[in-house]
């Protein structure tokens, strides 16, 4: 099977690029002693977990089905966290998770009796500081519901928990900024951390970014762990799968209204939602910054503003031409939806030996079932 034989749209995960990121993760672990758990909210394509497992320590989840998926398909440590648990959620996962992290002191009080003796118990804290490029993704934004604020903490709570989680970064490429956050947490919560077994610093630390000083990060994490006598965790998601995956699409039409728009057989609304939510234009492999031919890369959905990007090309685009939308693994496959009844992208993995293996495909029956399974009588 060759790439040009695959029917678009589809995601193509490259094993070599994935391993390149994982080797950086291993380097960080070796320097720091930190444990890394994959954030399934970002990437849950379990068909490639056998590639990832040797490098990471387990998974972390944001909902009960992610907990079950991590337990069944990844193994290692299974961390369960939710912004808001129901009692059924807690009971469903208490027997299969290694750590259960509550978002509030009230949820901790309500459900800890279900978890005690089964899993290590943690609490999410909100230090009121963060590193996030957009307010939508900022855990320390005004009126944040994420974690317990410092001035709301009941000190006695730390006598009955094993660890805490801070998640305050989003695409933080600045190691010094992260170390500054570590120092702020140590100063603000140090007396509490000294009583605990583990601390998770969450995700969003972009240690796989080109040129990132992994050694400096690792030594800072190691120093923090030694100072407070805790096992440190990070929860990478996009850091593991960044630049590993293309969304491959085909130009199905070209229209002109002042600008030329190449319409492709995919949509941000359905297949690459964060492009739309965060207004972050996609990048196209075939584009050229100095190309003379400019096109809007538009989707085939009915949403007027649904477009991937504006890009320049050396040669005019043609109907039937394929384009590779780069870096399309994070928060894409986990957010796929059936808007407009569009064809759902298949998922493939390009192995190191050149083989292409199918991981998932969808058809009309999947679309129909997602809408109803039974009719009114």
From Swiss-Prot:
Q: How does activity depend on temperature?
A: Optimum temperature is 37 degrees Celsius. 75% and 51% of the maximum activity remains at 30 and 45 degrees Celsius, respectively, but the activity decreases rapidly at temperatures above 55 or below 20 degrees Celsius.
| InterPro entries in UniProt | Ala_racemase/Decarboxylase_C, Nsp_de-COase, PLP-binding_barrel
Q: Name one GO biological process term.
A: spermidine biosynthetic process
- Gene Ontology CC annotations of this record: cytoplasm
The answer, when asked if RNA-binding is one of the entry's keywords, is: no
Q: Which reaction is recorded as catalysed by this protein? A: carboxynorspermidine + H(+) = norspermidine + CO2; carboxyspermidine + H(+) = spermidine + CO2
Does the record's keyword annotation contain Repeat? Answer: no
Q: Which cofactor does it need?
A: pyridoxal 5'-phosphate
The protein's location, in the record's own words, is:
Cytoplasm
Instruction: Give the record's free-text account of how this protein's activity is regulated.
Output: Dithiothreitol greatly stimulates activity, maximum stimulation being at 5-20 mM dithiothreitol concentration. Fe(3+), Fe(2+) and Mn(2+) severely inhibit activity (88%, 82% and 50%, respectively), whereas Zn(2+) has a slightly inhibitory effect (23%) and Mg(2+), Ca(2+), Cu(2+) and Cu(+) have no effect.
Residues with PTM N6-(pyridoxal phosphate)lysine: 41
Q: EC number(s) of the enzyme?
A: 4.1.1.96
Q: Which domain of life is it from?
A: Bacteria
- List the Gene3D superfamilies hit by this protein, alphabetically: Alanine racemase (3.20.20.10), Lyase, Ornithine Decarboxylase, Chain A, domain 1 (2.40.37.10)
Q: Where are the transmembrane segments?
A: none
- Write the record's keywords in alphabetical order, separated by commas: Cytoplasm, Decarboxylase, Lyase, Polyamine biosynthesis, Pyridoxal phosphate, Spermidine biosynthesis
GO MF terms, alphabetically ordered: carboxy-lyase activity; diaminopimelate decarboxylase activity
Q: Can you tell me which residues bind substrate?
A: 238, 274
pH dependence comment: Optimum pH is 8.25. Stable at pH 7.5 and 4 degrees Celsius in the presence of DTT, EDTA and NaN(3) for at least one month. 57% and 72% of the maximum activity observed at pH 7.5 and 9.0, respectively.
Give, as one word, the top-level EC class. Answer: lyase
What the record says about family reads: Belongs to the Orn/Lys/Arg decarboxylase class-II family. NspC subfamily.
* PANTHER family according to UniProt: CARBOXYNORSPERMIDINE_CARBOXYSPERMIDINE DECARBOXYLASE, DIAMINOPIMELATE DECARBOXYLASE
Primary role: Catalyzes the decarboxylation of carboxynorspermidine and carboxyspermidine. 2,3-diaminopropionic acid, 2,4-diaminobutyric acid, L-ornithine or L-lysine cannot serve as substrates.
What assembly does the database describe for this protein? Answer: Homodimer.
NCBIfam families from the entry?
Answer: nspC
Q: Report the protein name in the record.
A: Carboxynorspermidine/carboxyspermidine decarboxylase
Source organism of this protein record: Vibrio alginolyticus
């Amino acid at each position: 099977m060759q790439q040009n034989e695959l029917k678009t749209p589809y995601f193509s995960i490259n094993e070599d690029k994935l391993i390149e990121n994982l080797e950086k993760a291993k380097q960080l672990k070796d320097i720091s002693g930190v444990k890394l758990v994959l954030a399934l909210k970002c990437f849950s394509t379990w068909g490639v977990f056998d590639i990832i497992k040797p490098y990471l320590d387990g998974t972390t989840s944001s909902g009960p089905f992610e907990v079950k998926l991590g337990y069944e398909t990844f193994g290692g440590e299974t961390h369960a966290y939710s912004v808001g648990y129901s009692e059924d959620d807690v009971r469903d996962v208490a027997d299969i998770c290694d750590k259960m992290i509550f978002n509030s002191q009230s949820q901790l009080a309500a459900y800890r009796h279900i978890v005690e003796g089964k899993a290590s118990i943690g609490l999410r804290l909100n230090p009121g500081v963060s590193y996030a490029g957009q307010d939508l993704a900022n855990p320390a934004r005004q009126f944040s519901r994420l974690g317990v604020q410092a001035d709301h903490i009941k000190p006695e709570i730390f006598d009955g928990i094993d660890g805490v989680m801070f998640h305050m970064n989003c695409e933080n490429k600045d190691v010094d900024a992260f170390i500054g956050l570590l120092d702020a947490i140590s100063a603000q919560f140090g007396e509490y951390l000294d009583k605990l077994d583990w601390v998770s610093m969450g995700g969003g630390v972009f240690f796989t970014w080109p040129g990132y000083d992994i050694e400096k990060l690792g030594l800072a994490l190691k120093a923090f762990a030694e100072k407070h006598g805790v096992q440190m965790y990070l929860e990478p998601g996009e850091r593991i799968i960044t630049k590993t995956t293309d969304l491959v699409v085909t130009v199905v039409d070209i229209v002109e209204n002042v600008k030329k728009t190449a319409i492709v057989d995919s949509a941000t609304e359905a297949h690459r939602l964060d492009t739309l939510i965060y207004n972050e234009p996609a990048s196209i492999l075939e584009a050229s910054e100095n190309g003379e031919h400019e096109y809007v890369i538009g989707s085939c959905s009915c949403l007027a503003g649904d477009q991937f990007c504006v890009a320049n090309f050396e040669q005019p685009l043609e109907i039937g031409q394929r384009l590779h939308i780069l870096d399309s693994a994070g928060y894409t496959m986990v957010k796929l939806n059936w808007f407009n009844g569009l064809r759902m992208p298949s998922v493939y993995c390009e192995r190191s030996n050149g083989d292409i293996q199918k991981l998932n495909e969808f058809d009309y029956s999947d679309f129909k079932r997602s809408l109803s399974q039974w009719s009114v009588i």
